[in-house]
Design a protein with these regions (language model features):
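N-terminal type II signal-anchor transmembrane helix
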Residues: 1-51, 89, 108-109
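Non-catalytic, structured segments within soluble enzyme domains
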Residues: 22, 27, 111-366, 532, ...
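Short active-site loop at a secondary-structure junction
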Residues: 67-72, 389-399, 422-427, 450-470, ...
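A penicillin-recognizing enzyme superfamily signal
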Residues: 78, 289, 293-296, 300-302, ...
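Active-site SXXK
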Residues: 82-83, 229, 299, 359, ...
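Short, well-structured active-site flanking segments
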Residues: 91-101, 174-177, 236-239, 476-496, ...
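Conserved catalytic neighborhood of penicillin-recognizing serine enzymes
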Residues: 110-135, 186-189, 256-257, 435, ...
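Mid-domain, small-residue-enriched loop/turn segments at the edges of structured enzyme/sensor domains
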Residues: 500-506, 537-575
Length: 850
């Protein structure tokens, strides 16, 4: 009896000592424990998703893929699979399972290793939310106390829902919703018992039990899950027998991107990071952009096709690599495919290896092990590239170009496969809605995988003749008209700084004598632009460009500005052209229309300032002082006259003016009115002539009329010195687009090609705006305007139409006439008299007027 008594006393003492120790340990650790009450309002890390204007997913950013689901959305069989596998006594314990701990300890004692886990689902939840993954005794103790607290705070159902959304299941998938998508491309409610069991088996070792890493291990682990479900009575013997014989059809499924717009998506990502920091990737933001699938894909296709066409006509630079030489032992298929899989794809270009070649055909293997045939049709274009201005002879047989062992690039053209190469030239396209600045499409390069540099917004490139419409607008605001006569003859002037004559030339070097300003712009006459620049003054012209949103620091104050020596981005150029298309308003480009939080609440909605040419909104710069000098035909006085230069209105005054308009007109804010609406119409009309010309001459953009088969468009070519940059920018109903093409390496120019006859409809000759950039503009605008009714140019109030003589710009007095637009009060008043043009004397040298 004494023994029993002592034993009981000892047991009680041990229990009290143990309880006291546990309590003391708890008191010691308690200050270090996080507040589990945060689980009541927990925000799971959800990736940022970017959508098109019509709700299609175009990008997703965030380290963790998670698709939150409620417990009601998860099939009961899946919940039971996790409970059977991870915590069969889940509904019986209070956070910590002594029975489970004893069972795991017993197995470990008798087997010599820990084959069963002792952590309950609640403990795993505590670990996943609050603790590090390190394996230490202190972490385990904290885990136990936290689990008990969690059980006191949350219901079993709340614990399960958090656990099933939080648990890591491999391949960046967090939660069962993401795992169902990653491995099977399904939502959780679409999963079979087989697939549920696979996912339920992942928490123990997601990196090794997943079916993408090891199918054998995945099958074995699935069968363990099924066995435990059978033991717990969650499935029948028949279900067990049938399911364990089923194959696991798993593949990696990326987020369901409807279409890709990588350059614009990256702009959105940067903007979101600037606003919200790292939480942008974790808080489940949904961002809706201004682009749509049809328009964006048309832009990407237009740019890629144009770049590939340019690259093909300049010749083939040879294989990307030689895997084995002719005469050496060929690589086996596995080695070939492993090598090709390590290479990226660029748009439509796929890496391939030539496995056989004869004069008529070559066979190439792709990364997936399939083979394609390259006939002479797909190789004929590949005459040797010698330089940007020289190409070799057209190949006569396939083996002139391809040999076995070469690593090449191929692309599919219709049903055939063609040889290709990764272009060295690059391009950008920006398209905006001129009424409100919404970005309709944006392409920053040939392929985002090739280069993440966004040429649409970051590349400052000389604009060449793309600048002329802005400068002619300045000249007309100063007093010139579309009928003003300017002399198209060569110019030569001593440049003291350079120590040589400055001799701007037309391209091509053809001169027509006295011509109207409309023709000067339509045919892109360089010397005519220089004379107009001299007439209005360089400083006035340079400052006037700021009205179109061009940064002052990028504008040179020299006569070379007339030829486009200023450097702007395609986005800036498109914004400037929008002013001419929308009636004179400077809209701000924007690309995020709405931001929602993870609950669907709208936390941002764009309210762009819009153009309103029909509104009575004054020009914020006031009326430009007209130059009497122009009427007096005295060029030099205009050029040196500083008191007549344009003076910019400070931005605070512009904002005050806009606020006054808002108060007057209501909630809608209007973009700054930077040039008067009649003047904007005149230059818009002149851009139309650049495409359609007049009887007797073509505009430099004539191909757009041929390709689009509509007359409500306008645009302007642009080519810089030595053809280092080529542009085409212009408008159509509801859209303004600018396209640039060139090399990132500023030392290279776009060069010259000769016709080979091997490429259908090949462009040849010197590269420039019309040949190198305009094809992309035409293709894109044709797609965007398909089905859009023509909208003839309609003169706004303040414009009068006068029949003028095309040779003199005066009132018509015969058959050589056309209708011309004038701002009321600037139309000619004298009848045309045909006589020889006047010259004036400048510094002792004969100098033609303007």
């Amino acid at each position: 009896m004494k023994f029993v008594k002592y034993f009981l006393i000892l047991a009680v003492c041990c229990i009290l000592l143990g309880a006291g120790s546990i309590y003391g340990l708890y008191r010691y650790i308690e200050p270090q424990l996080p507040d589990v009450a945060t689980l009541k309002d927990v925000r799971l890390q959800i990736p940022m998703q970017i959508y098109s204007a019509d709700g299609e997913l175009i990008a997703q950013y965030g380290e963790k893929r998670r698709i939150p689901v409620t417990l009601d959305q998860i099939p009961p069989e899946m919940v039971k699979a996790f409970i059977a596998t991870e915590d069969s006594r889940f509904y019986e314990h209070h956070g910590v399972d002594p029975v489970g701990i004893f069972r795991a300890a017993s197995v470990a004692l008798f087997s010599g290793h820990a084959s069963q886990g002792a952590s309950t689902i609640t403990q795993q939840l505590a670990r996943n939310f609050f603790l590090s993954p390190e394996r230490t005794l202190m972490r385990k103790i904290k885990e136990v106390f936290l689990a008990i607290r969690i059980e006191q705070l949350l219901t079993k159902e709340e614990i399960l829902e958090l656990y099933l959304n939080k648990i890591y299941l491999g391949y960046r998938a967090y939660g069962v919703g993401a795992a169902a998508q990653v491995y099977f491309g399904k939502t959780v409610d679409q999963l079979t018992l087989n697939e549920m069991a696979v996912i339920a088996g992942l928490p123990k070792a997601p990196s090794t039990f997943n079916p993408l890493y090891s199918m054998d291990r995945a099958v074995a682990r699935r069968n363990v899950v099924l066995s435990r479900m059978l033991d717990e009575g969650y499935i029948t013997q028949q279900q067990f027998d049938q399911t364990r014989t089923e194959a696991i059809n798993a593949n990696y499924h990326a987020p369901e991107i409807a279409f890709s717009a990588p350059y614009l998506s990256e702009m959105v990502r940067q903007e979101m990071y600037n606003r919200y920091g790292e939480s942008a990737y974790e808080d489940g933001y949904r961002i809706y952009t201004t682009i749509t699938r049809k328009v964006q894909q048309a832009a990407q296709q237009a740019v890629r096709n144009n770049v590939l066409d340019y690259d093909m006509r300049h010749g083939y630079r040879g294989p990307a690599n030689v895997l084995w030489k002719v005469g050496e032992s060929a690589w086996d298929n596995n080695k070939i495919t492993d090598t090709l899989k390590a290479l990226p794809t660029y748009g439509p270009l796929l890496p391939a290896a030539v496995t056989s070649a004869n004069p008529q055909e070559a066979t190439a293997m792709l990364a997936d092990g399939s083979t394609v045939a390259l006939s002479m049709e797909g190789v004929r274009w590949a005459r040797p590239y010698r330089s940007d201005t020289q190409q070799g002879p057209t190949p006569r047989k396939v083996t002139d170009v391809l040999q076995t062992g070469q690593q090449i690039w191929v692309r599919q053209v219709g049903d055939a496969w063609w040889l290709a190469q990764v272009p060295e030239v690059n391009s950008a396209l920006v398209s905006i809605n001129p009424q409100n600045g919404a970005v309709m499409a944006l392409v920053g390069g040939f392929d985002f995988n090739q280069s993440k540099f966004n040429r649409a917004t970051q590349a400052l490139r000389q604009v060449g003749s793309n600048i002329k419409p802005f400068l002619y607008t300045a000249a007309m605001d100063k007093g010139l008209t579309l009928a003003s006569m300017l002399n198209d003859v060569p110019i030569s002037r001593w440049d003291a700084g350079a120590g040589s004559d400055w001799q701007p030339k037309n391209s091509p070097p053809q001169y027509a004598g006295l011509i109207r300003l409309r023709q000067g712009l339509g045919q892109s006459k360089n010397v005519v632009m220089v004379r107009a620049m001299r007439a209005m003054g360089v400083d006035y012209a340079a400052e006037y460009l700021q009205r179109f949103g061009f940064p002052a620091q990028n504008i040179v104050h020299t006569e070379s500005l007339a030829l486009g020596s200023a450097s702007f981005t395609p986005m800036q150029v498109a914004r400037g052209y929008a002013v001419m298309a929308n009636g004179g308003f400077l809209v701000d480009p924007w690309f995020i229309s709405k931001i929602e939080n993870d609950q669907g609440g709208v936390i941002f909605e764009a309210k762009p300032k819009v153009a309103c040419p029909e509104c009575d909104i004054p020009v914020i710069y006031g009326d430009t002082q007209k130059s009497n000098v122009l009427e007096n035909n005295d060029v030099e006085d205009v050029a040196i006259s500083r008191e007549q230069q344009n003076v910019s209105v400070p931005m605070p005054q512009l904002e005050q003016a806009n606020q006054a308009l808002v108060a007057k007109t209501g909630a809608q804010e209007y973009a700054p009115h930077v040039i008067n609406t009649p003047l904007a119409f005149l230059i818009k009309s002149a851009l139309n002539t650049n495409i359609f010309g007049e009887p007797g001459w073509q505009g430099t953009g004539w191909r757009a009329g041929r390709d689009l088969q509509r007359r409500d468009i306008g645009g302007k070519t642009g080519t810089t010195n030595s053809s280092k940059d080529a542009w085409f920018s212009g408008y159509g109903p509801g859209v303004v687009t600018s396209v640039w093409i060139g090399f990132d390496d500023h030392r290279r120019n776009l060069g010259h090609t000769t016709a080979s006859g091997a490429i259908k409809d090949q462009i040849s000759g010197y590269e420039g705006g019309a040949k190198s950039a305009q094809p992309a503009w035409d293709a894109y605008m044709k797609a965007v305007l398909e089905g859009v009714p023509e909208q003839p140019l309609t003169p706004p109030p303040g414009i009068v139409t006068v029949n003028i003589d095309r040779s003199t710009g005066q009132l018509a007095n015969g058959g050589n006439s056309r209708e011309e637009y004038f701002i009321e009060g600037t139309q000619p008043t004298q009848q045309a008299v045909h006589e020889v043009g006047t010259t004036i004397i400048d510094n002792g040298e004969a100098q033609e007027l303007f």
